[in-house]
Amino acid sequence: MSNHHAVEKTQAELAELFAKDLTTGVGRSVKHDSAAKHVSGEAQYIDDRLEFPNQLHVYARLSDRAHAKIISIDTKPCYAFEGVRIAITHEDVPGLKDIGPLLPGDPLLAIDDVQFVGQPVLAVAAKDLETARKAAMAAIIEYEDLEPVLDVVEALRKRHFVLDSHTHQRGDSAGALATAEHRIQGTLHIGGQEHFYLETQISSVMPTEDGGMIVYCSTQNPTEVQKLVAEVLDVSMNKIVVDMRRMGGGFGGKETQAASPACLCAVVAHLTGQPTKMRLPRVEDMLMTGKRHPFYVEYDVGFDSTGRLHGIALELAGNCGCSPDLSASIVDRAMFHADNSYYLGDATINGHRCKTNTASNTAYRGFGGPQGMVAIEEVMDAIARHLGLDPLAVRKANYYGKTERNVTHYYQTVEHNMLEEMTAELEESSQYFERREAIRRYNANSPILKKGLALTPVKFGISFTASFLNQAGALIHVYTDGSIHLNHGGTEMGQGLNTKVAQVVAEVFQVEMDRVQITATNTDKVPNTSPTAASSGADLNGKAAQNAAEIIKKRLIEFAARQYKVSEEDVEFHNGHVRIRDHILTFEALIQQAYFAQVSLSSTGFYKTPKIFYDRSQARGRPFYYYAFGAACCEVIVDTLTGEYKMLRTDILHDVGASLNPAIDIGQVEGGFIQGMGWLTMEELVWNAKGKLMTNGPASYKIPAVADMPLDLRVKLVENRKNPEDTVFHSKAVGEPPFMLGIASWCAIKDAVASLGDYKHQPKIDAPATPERVLWGCEQMRQLKAAKPAEAEAELASL
């Protein structure tokens, strides 16, 4: 209960300790709680766990057809392999056969047909993974091919949708376009992106008594896995416990996609009574799982001679793949963020959810927002080229105002707008205008190598657009030695969530972080959790943990006031000690006294985000609690004979409110920018004519490496600007907003290519801007520069 050998300190010594500040509370750059384990290889992931006795390994046989009717499945050849325990099809699933997260469309195993190359048709469980693989490939599947739809434009033209389209409308965009001083139209393809988490999808399931299961799953959404496992087994959720200590990366790819391996393992474990594990090899993982939604964009925009928008019509066609998954909300968010930082004037934005015979696309960092922002940044660049203006001048001319021109096309007022101040600060710190002139001079004297520069803003809304998800729970126990045990509903995927939440609890109790122990996210400790997504992890779970800690702290204050016969205002916690008027004692001493006085030292906490609502039928509301702002300035050099390029320098200024942990936040900004840059420059997904993903491994799908980093990367957080909303210690979310900073790299490449045409034409460079696309853009600029004005106009119109 206490250490009887400890030497008691005098009141003077305790007063000296009380006066000192915490070193690990909120606002300090505390290292990630698992940092040492990550770099030493000691961090335990699911595949590092000791295997259970008699554990089976599961391998799924995937469809090799994009669209086909299943005529027959013969699993008898599977049993010819020694060590095979069972082969299952959809007929063996005891409960619900569809694991669609919100709407049906994702059968656990194919039922009557297959909808994409990579869809699981059957699964084999055996003594080891290789035996299971060989046996699964021996099964005989007979198909009757059907005509697939593989192209998003074809799907749009055929109105081949997974869900109905949705419209945001403000004013009379058609009238504004018809009367605008200038008007341009264009199209843009925006590619998808593979999550490429280091740890592929994995689950391990242990059957328990009474039909229960313990599910160890690498998931961002433990409650959804719990729910779906219960449904496929036809049992109640209280029979299923999901345990999630850490993921080896997620980025949205483990929000819904983690359910399939967990459910397959659960079915096998149910049928055999044996523990079961399924780990996807990289190729199978990339074939089975959805990506970031590719988008096709059509724009029609009217503006004046300063570049200010008068009206805009946008068609945003998201390639959703073969089922709804989360596409309703993802395309909605693309529409919400199709303004980025700009007042659009009269606007019509149509969002289409196109169905193609590819894997069902899913959540990815930004959740549709980046695609909407890329569309409007293409428009800003196109206006600048049309008018012969600096693209930054056009962007600033369209910024949201503070007291006017400050309402979005979905009728949310942009409050606490920091765009102008942040842009001005970044202009100065990055020496934008001096470098712009220097680059013009360089390009005028360099026929082959061309430099580009772009400064782009970010305004990103924080909250789940599905309002009911904006809630979180936490559970805190304080033990009699003064140590603290914390569980919350969020999941740790390397982003530092556990560290931040522990800092919050340490700050409330005014103890150092080493007193706070966070263990695995577990559905039997914190139930009904929302996914760790939408940048909400710290906002929701930090606030829930703060609530739980404050409940216990209030009990302690009330007890101390009674015990020492003082007012509650006389009780103060600071640096691991408690001052009760003139008397000081250690935190653990107060805890022991409270325990003997039968004060509860445990509490749940709960939080729900206030103020938000969205009426989808009217397409208006306040879907976001607040906005996070940022800006990035990128400089690039392009070899116009090969299309190759190098990022020379990037300056970033980002708004995180009052940072909970500046070191972790800067790491998130750096990583977000690089991942966004990778999406828009090198991460190209390629399917063949039969719908098979060809870029299905690290040999063919390239993510940024060390050599792709800007040679000079400067990141700064906005200082002395707390979040005006009542968030956890007035911080702001930092998971997704920095991703959109990468748009500056794409715009800088286009700026360099545009210099070949004297900045008079907008290069046709779809995203990602691979060297091949950049080379074609360079050739286009050369042809336009050589053409007569009428010919150039005709050429542009044909693009």
PLM regions and their residue ranges:
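C-terminal catalytic domains of large/alpha subunits in multi-subunit enzymes
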Residues: 5-7, 90-91, 234-239, 269-276, ...
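Flexible, low-hydrophobicity surface segments
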Residues: 1-165, 183-186, 271
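Helix-loop-helix junctions that connect adjacent transmembrane helices in secondary transporters/permeases
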Residues: 153-233, 399-483, 694-708, 712-716
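Extended active-site and interfacial segments that coordinate phosphate-rich ligands
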Residues: 33-37, 58, 137-144, 220, ...
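Short beta-strand elements
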Residues: 43, 202-207, 296-305, 311-316, ...
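Phosphate/diphosphate-binding loops
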Residues: 127, 274-320, 543-572, 576
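Glycine-rich loop/linker segments at domain edges
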Residues: 28, 33-41, 166-203, 294-379, ...
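Thiamine diphosphate
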Residues: 248-273, 277-279, 497-505
